[in-house]
Amino acid sequence: KNPKKPDRDRFVLSKGHTAPGLYSALAQRGYFPVEDLKTLRHLGSYLQGHPDMKHIPGVDMSSGSLGQGISAAVGMALSAKLTNDDYRVYTLLGDGEIQEGQVWEAAMFAGFRRLDNLVVIVDNNGLQIDGPVDQVCSPYPIGEKFKAFNFHVIDLKDGNDMDQIADAFKEARNTKGMPTAIIAHTVKGKGVSFMENQVGWHGKAPNDEEYAVAMEDLRKEGEASVSYTHLRAHETVL
C-alpha cells in the first residue's frame, strides 16, 4: 500500500504500452483519483502512453522500450538477494516483446543466479502490432526457451482466468532455487465481439458507437462486473 516501502513487492510492466490497464488498477487501489483516468494522454497529464515512475505513485519502473523491463526486474530481484530482503518482483512481457534479444540475456542471468524471487509473466495472445507473432518473428516454443535458462515454467491454459492466475502465483511462490516464467495464453480483446483476436485493435481507441457496443458485450459476459471484491480474494497469493 505504501509505494515507497523498502520491502514492498515490485511490479514492472515491461510491455509499457499497456499502461491504461496498470493505471486503472492503481486508481482502484487508491494511488491516485479515479477521475484522473479521464486525462489519459492529455497534454500536461501525468498519465501518458507509457508509465513514468517519477510522476505516478505505485509505478516501480518507467517502461516502454520493449525488452528493457525484464532487465530492470532482474536487477531488483538480485538486489533483494544481495541485501537479504524477502520482497518479490513481478514483470509482465508481451509475446511480441520477447523477440528482443535483451529479454534472453536477462533470462539467462536470472536463471544463472537462481533468482527465485522473480516471476516473469508472458502475455501470449499471439498478436503484435505488425500481425501474428509467429509470422513476424516466431519466438516459439516460449516455455522451452525459459526452461533452457533454468526457469520453472507454468503453462497457463487460460490467461484470462483470474483463478488460474492466482494458482500460478501460488506455485511460483513455492518454487525455490529458480525463477518462474508463467506463459499465459490469452485472447486479445477478450469479451468484446469486434475486438477479439483482431490485430488492428492493438493500438487504437474505439469511437463512441464502438465503445457502447464494447460495454454492452462486456456486460453480457459479466466481464464489466468483475469486481475488485473478487480480485481481492487473491491479494495474499503474491
Where does each model-flagged region fall?
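Cofactor-binding active-site loop characterized by glycine-rich and histidine/acidic residues
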Residues: K1-F112
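A short alpha/beta connector and helix-capping loop motif
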Residues: Q102-N125, A181
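Active-site pocket-lining segment
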Residues: L118-D130, G143-A148
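Active-site metal-binding loops of divalent metal-dependent hydrolases
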Residues: G94-E97, N124, T186
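Short, glycine/polar-rich helix-capping loops at beta-to-alpha or helix-loop-helix junctions
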Residues: Q135-G143
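Single conserved hydrophobic/aromatic residue that forms the stacking wall/gate
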Residues: H230-L238
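Glycine/aspartate-rich loop-and-adjacent alpha/beta segment that forms the canonical ThDP
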Residues: F151, G159-S227
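Short catalytic-loop micro-motif centered on adjacent basic/acidic residues
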Residues: T91-L93, H152-K157
